[in-house]
């Protein structure tokens, strides 16, 4: 079990609090000027394909010393061991947390309640391989004998965000199959998707562990009705629908052959499920071998995380730096900024991964915390963000630590596009770190022919304070393996922060209340009778909705 240590009661936290008093005066220009080896000291390589530069952070060796001491005092190493050994660290649900077993390419036994889960994991992988080979190869036929051309994944949350993010990020590896993702219960999402596909050549993947998720099953029934409007015979459903689920009776009742049901387990959290059968859409999009490469990449990062001392452990370093900003500098958000258009959903994926995991105000003792926990995560691809929100990062009043991610090698080396992209990648972190002082601004204005009065009027608005912290994550190329590295790196960063904050990162009770109330309200929307059972605001909104519809 995880320890229940209040981080603010540790010696390291007190030391960090004292250190922060002097650290507020840190200036990145001075830190780099004083230490020619700063980049070498504050960067790390993962294998031969990833470089993580954290030198442009408001830290020095003393900062890191206290942060590593905090990790040790909160018994992080024991927590890592507990997770990987299958202990039920998701204590509020009584479950192990073993998404790492899904990508355990070593096949070393992983025990849950004394039973090795690896044979079951490998059996599902073999089933996925056979299925994807048949569909991709054209052997799997629809009800009219035609090969499948389109895959529609119907899921929500972890059953959608992860597969969608990965299939987009790995688009250069795609085969001939067209992938579509439907998540929102808004009928527009399924209706617009169905306009693009042919019932004779479409395969639907229904991704719901329980096969009861409201949004997913509503969309699934709409898809089935649409399909049967053309196909007619209920028996044809089996050729066009597969299930990613554990509820065999419900799957069978829907009309899906349970031979085409791919199971996963309660020790797989939704936001960590792309490594499981939920990743079937990924395997169909890029081929099973590339899906295995994705697993291999994550497994490599798992090995690094488990076996590397804290001081050289990349997810640990990133997590601790995040805590430094979140809990001492008062930063409320972090931006993830991939300079790769294929990775346009990466920030959204980790928005769920981080905020659903660590958006908690109750500690592992069941008490309200007295300190900040999970940050707000957001971001967009560069260079788009530069023309949207970077203004606030550069010159706003909020401290927003940023992760910049970019590949050295583009999948689309058109003209000088990639050099221009990368020049922006390098320039932004330099500008954020070092800014532009008033003397430089004034000199530039004078050189541009401005008179003294104009210089005095304009100069204040063109000053950049700098000291905006960033991490730069440079990847040789985005491949299935390096993408697996990156995803696992961020997963483990989130875990480390949750351990230190003394919260449970693998439940998500915060999504339940809204669901319960929606189920109560749904029957109230069935007719035009006036509602008075809620607060005045909710009553007013429901009654206005009914009036608008009338």
UniProtKB/Swiss-Prot annotation:
Active site residues according to the UniProt entry: 356, 387, 515
Catalysed reactions, semicolon-separated: alpha-D-glucose 6-phosphate = beta-D-fructose 6-phosphate
PROSITE patterns: P_GLUCOSE_ISOMERASE_1, P_GLUCOSE_ISOMERASE_2, P_GLUCOSE_ISOMERASE_3
Root EC class: isomerase
Any single GO BP term: glucose 6-phosphate metabolic process
Pfam families reported for this sequence: PGI
Keyword annotations from UniProtKB, A to Z: Cytoplasm, Gluconeogenesis, Glycolysis, Isomerase
GO molecular function, one term: monosaccharide binding
UniProt xrefs under InterPro entries: G6P_Isomerase, G6P_Isomerase_C, Phosphoglucose_isomerase_CS, SIS_dom_sf, SIS_PGI_1, SIS_PGI_2
Pathway assignment: Carbohydrate biosynthesis; gluconeogenesis; Carbohydrate degradation; glycolysis; D-glyceraldehyde 3-phosphate and glycerone phosphate from D-glucose: step 2/4
Domain of life of the native organism: Bacteria
Compartment list: Cytoplasm
Enzyme Commission number(s) from the entry: 5.3.1.9
Disulphide bonds in the chain: none
Entry GO CC: cytosol
PANTHER family named in the record: GLUCOSE-6-PHOSPHATE ISOMERASE
The protein's role, per its UniProt record: Catalyzes the reversible isomerization of glucose-6-phosphate to fructose-6-phosphate.
Family listed: Belongs to the GPI family.
Protein name: Glucose-6-phosphate isomerase
């Amino acid at each position: 079990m995880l320890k229940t240590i209040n981080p603010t009661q540790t010696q390291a936290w007190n030391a960090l609090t004292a250190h922060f008093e002097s650290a507020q005066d840190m200036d990145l220009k001075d830190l780099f000027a004083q230490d020619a080896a700063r980049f070498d000291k504050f960067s790390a390589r993962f294998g031969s394909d990833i470089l993580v530069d954290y030198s442009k952070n408001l830290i020095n060796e003393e900062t890191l010393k206290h942060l590593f001491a905090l990790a040790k005092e909160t018994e992080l190493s024991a927590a890592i061991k507990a997770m990987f050994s299958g202990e039920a660290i998701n204590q509020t649900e009584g479950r192990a947390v073993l998404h790492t077993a899904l990508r355990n390419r070593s096949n070393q036994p992983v025990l849950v309640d004394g039973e090795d889960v690896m044979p079951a994991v490998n059996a599902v992988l073999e089933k996925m391989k056979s299925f994807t080979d048949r569909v991709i190869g054209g052997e799997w036929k629809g009800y009219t004998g035609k090969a499948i051309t389109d895959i529609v994944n119907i899921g929500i949350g972890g059953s959608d965000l992860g597969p969608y993010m990965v299939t987009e990020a790995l688009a250069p590896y795609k085969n001939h199959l067209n992938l579509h993702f439907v998540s929102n219960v808004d009928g527009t999402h399924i209706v617009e998707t169905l306009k693009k596909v042919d019932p004779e050549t479409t395969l639907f993947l229904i991704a719901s562990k329980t096969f009861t998720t409201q949004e997913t099953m509503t969309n699934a029934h709409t898809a089935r009705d649409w399909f049967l409007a053309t196909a007619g015979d209920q028996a044809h459903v089996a050729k066009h629908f597969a299930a990613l689920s554990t509820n065999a009776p419900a799957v069978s009742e829907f009309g899906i052959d349970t031979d085409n049901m791919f199971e996963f387990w309660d020790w797989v959290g939704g936001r960590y499920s792309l490594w499981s059968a939920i990743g079937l859409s990924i395997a169909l999009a890029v081929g099973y071998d590339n899906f295995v490469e994705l697993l291999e990449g994550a497994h490599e990062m798992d090995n690094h995380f488990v076996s590397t001392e804290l001081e050289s452990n990349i997810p640990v370093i990133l997590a601790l730096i995040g805590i430094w900003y979140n809990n001492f500098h008062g930063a409320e958000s972090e931006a993830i900024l991939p300079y790769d258009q294929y990775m346009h959903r990466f920030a959204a994926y980790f928005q769920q991964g981080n905020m659903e995991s660590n958006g908690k105000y109750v500690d592992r003792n069941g008490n309200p915390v007295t300190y900040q926990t999970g940050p707000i995560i957001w971001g967009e691809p560069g260079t788009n963000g530069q023309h949207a929100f970077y203004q606030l990062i550069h010159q706003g009043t909020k401290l927003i630590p940023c992760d910049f991610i970019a590949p050295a090698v583009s999948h689309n080396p058109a003209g000088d596009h990639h050099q221009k992209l990368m020049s922006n990648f390098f320039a932004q972190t330099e500008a954020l770190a070092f800014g532009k002082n008033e003397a430089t601004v004034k000199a530039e204005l004078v050189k541009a022919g401005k008179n003294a009065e104009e210089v005095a009027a304009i100069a204040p608005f063109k000053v950049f304070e700098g000291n905006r912290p960033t991490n730069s994550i440079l990847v040789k190329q985005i491949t299935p393996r390096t993408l697996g590295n990156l995803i696992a790196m961020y997963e483990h960063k989130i875990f480390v922060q949750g351990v230190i904050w003394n919260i449970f990162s693998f439940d998500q009770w915060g999504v339940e209340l809204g669901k319960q109330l929606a189920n109560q309200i749904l029957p109230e929307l069935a007719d035009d009778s006036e509602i008075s059972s809620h607060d005045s605001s909710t009553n007013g909104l429901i009654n206005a909705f009914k009036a608008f519809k009338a």
